[in-house]
Structures are given as C-alpha cells and as structure tokens.
C-alpha cells in the first residue's frame, strides 16, 4: 500500500518505520521544520540537551518497544526520581509512608489512610484522590497541582488521568518500576531520525492529495482533521521559562513538583536527566495554560463532556476509508512515549484491515485499544 504518515512525532515515526518494514511504501509529512513532535530534543547554547516541550523519561514494560528503540539508540541509565516541595520542604515523590512519618501532619494523614475505603470512589478526580490518599494529602499535593494543571476544579474531571497513576508506597521508590528506563544518549530527535532514515520526509507541510494514497495515518488533532465540525476539543498547553546555572535542591531528582507554587507546576533539570558531564545547568519551569493562540496542544482534558465530544469525532473519523487518527492528538489520549509506541504496534492489524471494516467496527476496535 501507499501510506502517508502525517506528523513525525514518536507515534508517526514508529508507525512509519513499522509499516515500511512490513513492505508498504511510506511517506512522512511534518508541519514543523524538524521531527520529534512533543519529544523533540535540541541543544542549548551552553551545550545541554533538552526537550522544549518538557522533560521526558522513557520507560516501558513492553519488550517489543524496548527492542525497537534499542535498534536506533543507546540509552543512559537514568531512573526517574522526582521531588516535591510541600510547605517549603523538598520531599521524595511519590510520597511514601516513610516520607509521611516525617511530615507535620503525619498523625492525621496516617489516620486518614487507615480509614480509606477498600474500593476507590470513581465518581470524579477529586473523590478518587481523596478515597486513595485521604483529605489532608489531597489538599497538600493534589488539589492545587491539579487545578493549575487542568484549569478546572478536580471534581469536574473524570478519573482517567489519575487512576493508577500515583500509588502510595511503604518506602521511597522511583516514579516508574519498569526495568527498562532512561533517555537516548543523543536525545529523542536522533533516535527518531535513525528510525526513519530510509523513509522519505517532507518538512514544513502537511498538505496532501488524498487520491495519491491508500491510507493516511494522521497524528494531528482529530478535531482539526474534521475541520472542527463539532466544535473545539480542549487541550492544555504549557508555557516554558528557563534559568541557567540556578541552584538545584537535590541532584538525585531530575524533576521537582511544585504543587503550592502560584504559577508553576514543576521544574526540570535537563543535565541530570541526560546525565551530561558539563559545568552548566539548564532548569525549565512549566506553567500550564490553555492550548489557544497557537500554543501547542499537549494534554487532553478528561471531562465527561470532552470525552463525549471526542467519541463523536472518532465515530465520524472512522467513516473514512483512508484516514486513520493516531497518537495523542488524533486519539485524544494521554500517552507516555513507551505507551505511544506500544499502541502504535497494537494498531497495525487494524490499520491493515481498515478498508475491510465498517465504521462501527473501526470505532469499536480503536476504543478497545484505548482502554487497554
């Protein structure tokens, strides 16, 4: 088949490579002047590798994903350690009973944890969080962070983003427990460049003639694909600010969450994450903002209304015999990098059968894949 991939982010590049090596003719179009999408890596004037859309620690339990990325880059041995500032004190994150015992409200927090229901309350983001962590911890490290992050009261959100994302441990641990973790030695852009080295690539354009292709894998916004027929699907974005050679509280942490800061939600130390032996530092501060006025859409906002609107768009998109939505923006799904590649791999049978299915079966199969 003649296949066009629109978007050279991690999903687009992965599917382009996989479809090419299944014998299909593939072309990639990318609207930016570079590949990489949201995991694009570049280098600062002082020589520090960094990701302009936020620091990313790669991790996966999927051996298929591990084997694929290791074909195109060596990885450093960074394991994602994160700190969190609560009441002006730096603590380990995710919070553990070990950390809680040293907190001012430890007695009340431990009492609330003991009284938690056995089954979390899935009514909304807030009820789930309180039923998992108790009211005191919720107010300390979840409520303000989440309100800043999403621009909404947590009770307006569904549980999809937070469910199973944060777990309370007995002792301090890494954020991710996957055996395979790290960052590509030369960054994500180089990894993806190697992945698609044998595939034609056109930058600065995503215009295409549908008649020239058998299938088009579209990793842009699904609402944009359908010309915003049902209205705008809301996303959150981030505004990034940088400080060089600023003091960093603890060299064990690549990122530090700032739930009580009036503006920022977190800060990233790229030298630590990329494990560069260099004198300079580059700290990135992240401020959540609406994805408007050409700000990049980064995070789907999980409210009941938004999910219903996405489902409406997805049903309509599935009526096309040629164009298939993929990736975080096309499927309105928060995907970490390992998850994005894993989902891309899982979508291949659907992609190859797309023309033989009716739109209801296409829709059902995508929803099934997204629920895994």
Q: How would you describe each model-predicted region?
A:
Residues 2-28:
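N-terminal Rossmann-like FAD-binding beta1-loop-alpha1 element of flavoenzymes
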Residues 7, 79, 199-206, 327:
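Short loop/edge segments at beta-strand edges and connector loops
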Residues 10-11, 33-35, 46, 98, ...:
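Short, solvent-exposed loop/turn segments at secondary-structure junctions
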Residues 20-45:
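Glycine-rich FAD pyrophosphate-binding loop
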Residues 22, 206-316:
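Mid-domain catalytic core of redox enzymes
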Residues 46-118:
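Dinucleotide-binding Rossmann-like beta1-alpha1 core, especially the glycine-rich loop
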Residues 87-215, 219, 223-226:
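Active-site/ligand-binding neighborhood in enzyme catalytic cores
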Residues 95, 268-372:
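Conserved flavin/dinucleotide-binding core of flavoenzymes
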């Amino acid at each position: 088949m003649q296949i066009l991939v629109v978007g050279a982010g991690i999903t687009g590049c992965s599917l382009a490579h996989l479809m090419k090596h299944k014998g299909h003719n593939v072309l990639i179009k990318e609207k930016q002047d570079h590949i990489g999408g949201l995991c694009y890596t570049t280098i600062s004037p002082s020589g520090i590798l960094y990701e302009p859309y936020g620091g990313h620690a790669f991790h996966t339990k999927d051996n298929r994903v591990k084997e694929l990325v290791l074909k195109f880059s060596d990885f450093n041995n960074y394991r994602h350690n994160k700190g969190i500032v609560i009441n002006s004190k730096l603590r380990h994150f995710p919070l553990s009973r070990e950390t809680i015992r040293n907190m001012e409200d430890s007695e009340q927090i431990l009492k609330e944890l003991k009284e938690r229901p056995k089954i979390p309350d899935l009514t909304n983001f807030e009820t789930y969080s309180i039923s998992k962590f108790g009211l005191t911890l919720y107010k300390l490290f979840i409520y303000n962070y989440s309100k800043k992050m999403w621009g909404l009261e947590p009770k307006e959100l569904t549980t999809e983003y937070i469910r199973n994302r944060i777990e309370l441990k007995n002792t301090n641990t890494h954020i991710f427990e996957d055996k395979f973790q790290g960052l590509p030695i030369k960054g994500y852009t180089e990894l993806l460049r190697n992945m698609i080295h044998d595939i034609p690539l056109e930058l600065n354009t995503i215009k295409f003639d549908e008649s020239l292709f058998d299938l088009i894998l579209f990793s842009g916004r699904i609402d944009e694909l359908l010309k915003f027929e049902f209205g705008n699907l809301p996303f959150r974005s981030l505004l990034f600010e940088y400080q060089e050679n600023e003091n960093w509280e603890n060299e064990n942490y690549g990122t530090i969450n700032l739930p009580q800061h009036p503006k920022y939600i977190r800060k990233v130390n790229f030298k630590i994450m990329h494990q560069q032996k260099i004198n300079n530092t580059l700290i990135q501060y992240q401020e959540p903002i609406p994805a408007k006025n050409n700000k990049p859409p980064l995070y789907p906002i999980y409210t009941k209304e938004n999910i219903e609107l996405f489902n409406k768009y997805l049903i309509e998109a599935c009526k096309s015999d040629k164009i298939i939505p993929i990736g975080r923006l096309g499927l309105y799904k928060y995907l970490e990098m390992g998850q994005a590649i894993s989902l891309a791999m899982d979508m291949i049978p659907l992609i190859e059968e797309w023309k033989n299915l009716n739109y209801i079966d296409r829709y059902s199969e995508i929803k099934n894949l997204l629920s895994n």
